[in-house]
């Protein structure tokens, strides 16, 4: 069987829940049997003693797992601004990035810096909005902030309703024309928009 390889990085402002998301991905893909936490010193990817002592990610780490017919390399990066150089080194090898945003804080200054770096390196990016259970605002107002401060083509995949398909369609003129004629958008077309950095 010919397997494809995908390199994906998890990037975020400090305390957004980035390593927790990485642990969850590894757990649900069968790579680990128990999810750890940075602050407990038992995160799978935070193996350095200094990371365990301080409760933060300092060094980029990788884990590999199989997802369907793809070999995936997951890179967990530091979120603290003091270790930005370590994070930026990983951008050169990424096929895709997951930018984690803390729902209770919204788009922070460092989030904007990360976004600009992802755009500079032309990395297709998924946004993962974390900690919405702690948010003091509605998902709609947070989405509005993200579209205003990051990109108007950031779309919530929470509901696949008519509004979702309209927001996806306006990301590309050709797709919009097709959508207005047929009222349909195929999954492959959405994948292509993401890969070509027209949809986030």
Give short role names for the model-derived ranges.
Residues 1-101, 107, 141, 150, ...:
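P-loop NTPase switch module centered on the Walker A-proximal segment
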